């Protein structure tokens, strides 16, 4: 903006901090929680092509440590759900697919949530989340959403879309970076089994996510004087408009 001639430029911060926690249907939350039962749950959210196989490999390793673990996969593009399911089934995984109305049972290892608008539901059920788009060269996805719903965060090395947020989270010891399926499985297993560590991470991430939640108010306060001066003024000398009844 300064290069374009602006004399005074302010950067209030990322407006994603101001977003409310993602919503979830109480009915869906109850129904899905009933299907899951007391199984330990983690989720790989907003995954991109190439990441589902990494997540599935991590799940295979996890089962050796936590036999009843349930892995939820939420692809960034739900249209890929059927293809993801077919590919994972072809390698021997037992799956259930939400868009197809398939229920979770005791044999289900991978639950594919290929629907729109249910990320808030999944964050409320999972204890740990891997943030997708970070084990492929995409730049990551929004990790504040997980932080605001008490979900411990693990991510890959590609988080360039959220550099500042990641730096703050890392400084607060709120997140963990992994490089491959082995490290992913190890991180998830540790967080699922270590309540104290997970609680510390959750608290640290929530503090980072919430300390700037007034950022939108600050932006509006800065813009208000300009909006007031730019607003058209009514001509008080003009007669009021008449309303004509229609028959």
Regions found by a protein language model. Give the residues of each.
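Nucleotide-activated sugar donor-binding and catalytic core shared by glycosyltransferases
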Residues: 1-247
């Amino acid at each position: 903006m300064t290069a374009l001639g602006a004399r005074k430029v302010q950067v209030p911060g990322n407006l994603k901090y101001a977003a409310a926690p993602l919503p979830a249907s109480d009915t869906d939350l109850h129904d899905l929680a009933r299907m899951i039962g007391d199984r330990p749950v983690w989720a790989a959210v907003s995954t991109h092509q190439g990441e589902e196989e990494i997540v599935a490999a991590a799940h295979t390793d996890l089962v050796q440590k936590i036999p009843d673990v349930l892995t939820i996969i939420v692809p960034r593009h739900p249209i890929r759900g059927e293809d993801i399911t077919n590919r994972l089934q072809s390698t021997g995984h037992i799956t259930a697919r939400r868009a197809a109305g398939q229920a979770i049972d005791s044999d289900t290892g991978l639950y594919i949530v290929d629907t729109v608008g249910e990320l808030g539901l999944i964050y409320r059920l999972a204890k740990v989340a891997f943030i997708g788009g970070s084990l492929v060269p995409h730049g990551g996805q929004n990790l504040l959403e997980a932080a605001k719903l008490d979900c411990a965060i693990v991510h890959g090395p590609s988080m360039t879309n959220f550099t500042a947020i990641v730096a703050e989270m890392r400084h607060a010891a709120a997140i963990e970076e992994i490089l491959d399926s082995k490290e992913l499985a190890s991180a998830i297993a540790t967080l699922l089994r270590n309540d104290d560590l997970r609680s510390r991470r959750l608290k640290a991430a929530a503090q980072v996510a919430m300390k700037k939640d007034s950022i939108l108010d600050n932006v509006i306060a800065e813009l208000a004087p300009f909006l007031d001066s730019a607003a058209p003024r009514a001509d008080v000398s003009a007669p009021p408009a008449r309303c004509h009844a229609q028959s």
